[in-house]
Amino acid sequence: MHADEDFSPAAERVGMSSPLSHCQYAPSVAAMTAVRRMVFVPFSAEQMYELVNDVVAYPNFLPWCAGSEILSQDAARMRARLRLKKGPLDASFTTDNRLETGRRIILSLVDGPFSRLHGQWQFEPADGGSMVRLELEFEFSGKLLGKVFTAAFKPIADSLVEAFRARAYVIYGR
């Protein structure tokens, strides 16, 4: 499966359940933009987890990332800030990331131009490599600004899985 394909029921058969589907808070889906991507890579789940969790390296390979910093971190959590710059979008946001080493990173919005942002990365071992899955739901604050920012941010979100797949080949070879 390629990074630009949406999930199908087959994606669920690989055993990658989503904790987002069990959230008690159910935001209005009509206003939310959702991104769901999955790709197989010939690298371990642990290697892919390390790439995604290396927030400080993002400006080195994500062209829209104008800056990143880790505000706090321990074994189970990381608070990080990213600065995005693409077209009319020039904004910083902070997330609290719950870390399940080698398996999952769950993102929750702390502050930024979003009214809502939550999601997760999942890394599942598979024969000859791993499956990398991203689920992201977001909504920008303000109706007019929200439309402009969504138009700029959705392509960024859509390209994330492919960007990390490409980065894995640069870092790990093959």
Regions found by a protein language model. Name each.
Residues 16-75, 128, 174:
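Hydrophobic ligand-binding cavity/cleft-lining segments
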Residues 48-49, 58, 80, 132-134, ...:
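Hydrophobic pocket/interface hotspot
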Residues 5-6, 21:
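Short linear segments in intrinsically disordered or otherwise low-structure-confidence regions
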